[in-house]
């Protein structure tokens, strides 16, 4: 059964068990999925309201983007655990002969690269989700303004969590060109996303103060 098909209670219990997966990566993806779900909700609470008629077309576009990102981030919950399981499986490979040891090392490097690409892709989705959320600020139902703030917080948590997973995976990769590429691009995504999240949160905070 997929993680996304579990109830909230079931997911929390398996997350808190002694099973190594799901772990922080899947939890980060869930945080991000919750964030963009709130953005989508705010759009739904805005569409069709006369008070926000001038923003109707704009918010419909934001809603469509949010729905698409929601699907992708929900998929990321399982993708992260699947990537971790590939790494775990390598530890079970034989290592008696030199050939087996070499094959195991090669398999581990390949698995770690795949495990790095998963949270990195998540970071890209989250930055897109934050950009989408920002598009709703000031043009959506003010009664749900706090929900956009919570959306930004959840998305930022997901972003930071995904970044930590990128870092822990590249720490075991020997291909320095790969490491430098993902570290550099990851830092850029982290900065861009964090700035967006902070801007959204501060704007909402000031509007409610």
Predicted regions, residues:
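Phosphate-handling active-site elements
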Residues: 38-58
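Short, hydrophobic/aliphatic alpha-helical segments
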Residues: 3-21
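Amphipathic alpha-helix face/heptad-repeat signature
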Residues: 30-34, 62, 69-76, 115-125, ...
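Preference for long, well-ordered alpha-helical segments
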Residues: 129, 144-203
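Conserved phosphate/anionic-ligand binding catalytic regions in large, soluble enzymes, centered on
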Residues: 17-40, 144-162
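Polytopic transmembrane helical bundles with strong interfacial aromatic enrichment
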Residues: 4-6, 121, 168-169
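A structural-propensity feature for long, helix-poor, extended segments
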Residues: 51-87, 189
């Amino acid at each position: 059964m997929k993680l996304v098909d579990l109830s909230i209670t079931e997911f929390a219990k398996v997350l808190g068990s002694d099973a190594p997966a799901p772990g922080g990566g899947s939890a980060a993806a869930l945080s991000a999925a919750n964030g963009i779900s709130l953005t989508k909700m705010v759009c739904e609470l805005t569409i069709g309201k006369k008070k926000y008629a001038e923003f109707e077309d704009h918010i419909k576009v934001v809603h469509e983007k949010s729905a698409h990102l929601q699907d992708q981030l929900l998929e990321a919950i399982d993708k992260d655990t699947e990537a971790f399981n590939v790494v775990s499986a390598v530890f079970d490979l034989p290592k008696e002969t030199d050939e087996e040891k070499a094959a195991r090392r090669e398999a581990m490097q390949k698995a770690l690269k795949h495990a790095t690409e998963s949270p990195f892709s998540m970071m890209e989705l989250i930055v897109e989700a934050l950009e989408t959320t920002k598009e709703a600020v000031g043009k959506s139902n003010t009664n749900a303004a706090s929900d956009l703030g919570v959306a930004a917080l959840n998305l930022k948590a997901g972003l930071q969590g995904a970044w930590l997973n990128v870092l822990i995976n590249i720490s075991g990769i020997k291909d320095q060109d790969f490491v430098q590429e993902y570290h550099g691009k990851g830092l850029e995504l982290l900065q861009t996303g964090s700035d967006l999240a902070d801007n959204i949160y501060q704007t909402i905070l000031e509007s409610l103060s």
